[in-house]
């Protein structure tokens, strides 16, 4: 942000959070004449002109629907244990909204009487190593969840690796986030059950649109919401093919 402001750029796209420091930086950039669009993470207390991201509540409902699909396929009367991994240092409310969406979907769209127990597990996201350690602690516990929901790419990759390392493939269903090559191949191997893919090309276009509208009219939409898609065994080959073409 400092480099962008010093350079006097015409606009700034930044992956933000709700920290006071980020609010001050965004406000300073706007005061200097550089409109700011927040991306992925928002800063609602700043003078940013727009936010481009995903609808956290709808994202949560989609995770909830995937849990219900897995519950319907289970042939057991035991409660289904679902763990949602939450970042300890995420300074925004998006995670809480996702969890609300999951809970609402489980309560409103449940078709059978299967009991689903949802718990939140706090992950130390100080760095990659701390995330890995937090997730490995889950697998050291004697009572493992039946389903783990990951709200970011790093958690998804770390849970996938832990499931393999602790020989839990087929015992724990992973609902991930994002569509890296590693995650897609894990779905192909049936280690990760499904992941949520964001239309990043659409997000980029929204960012440009927001800045252009702001320069042309002096204002723009406060929010742009990108499309999300569930990737699972039924369509993973299509996405792997797209990545191979891109390479």
Predicted regions and their residues:
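Local beta-strand N-terminus motif with an aromatic residue
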Residues: 9, 48, 79, 144-145, ...
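Short, solvent-exposed amphipathic alpha-helices that sit
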Residues: 59-63, 93-114, 130, 134, ...
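Hydrophobic alpha-helical segments within soluble ligand-binding/sensing domains
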Residues: 52-80, 97, 129-132, 179-183, ...
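Hinge/cleft segment of the Venus flytrap/periplasmic-binding protein
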Residues: 85-86, 199-247
């Amino acid at each position: 942000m400092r480099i962008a402001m010093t350079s006097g750029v015409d606009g700034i796209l930044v992956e933000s959070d709700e920290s006071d420091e980020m609010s001050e930086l965004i406000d300073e950039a706007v005061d200097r004449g550089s409109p700011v669009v927040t991306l992925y993470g928002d800063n609602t207390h700043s003078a940013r002109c727009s936010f481009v991201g995903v609808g956290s509540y709808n994202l949560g409902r989609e995770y909830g629907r995937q849990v219900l699909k897995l519950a319907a396929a289970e042939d057991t009367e035991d409660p289904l244990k679902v763990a949602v991994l939450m970042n300890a240092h995420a300074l925004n409310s998006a995670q809480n909204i996702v969890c609300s969406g999951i809970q609402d979907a489980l309560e409103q769209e449940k078709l059978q009487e299967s009991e689903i127990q949802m718990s939140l597990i706090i992950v130390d996201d100080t760095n990659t190593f701390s995330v890995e350690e937090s997730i490995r602690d889950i697998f050291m516990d004697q009572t493992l969840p039946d389903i783990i929901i990951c709200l970011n790419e790093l958690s998804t990759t770390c849970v996938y690796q832990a499931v393999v390392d602790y020989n839990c493939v087929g015992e724990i269903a992973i609902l991930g986030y994002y569509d890296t090559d590693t995650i897609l191949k894990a779905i192909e191997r049936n280690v990760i059950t499904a992941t949520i893919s964001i239309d990043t090309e659409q997000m980029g276009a929204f960012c440009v649109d927001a800045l252009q509208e702001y320069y042309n009219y002096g204002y723009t939409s406060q929010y742009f919401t990108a499309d999300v898609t569930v990737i699972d065994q039924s369509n993973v080959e299509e996405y792997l093919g797209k990545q191979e073409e891109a390479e």
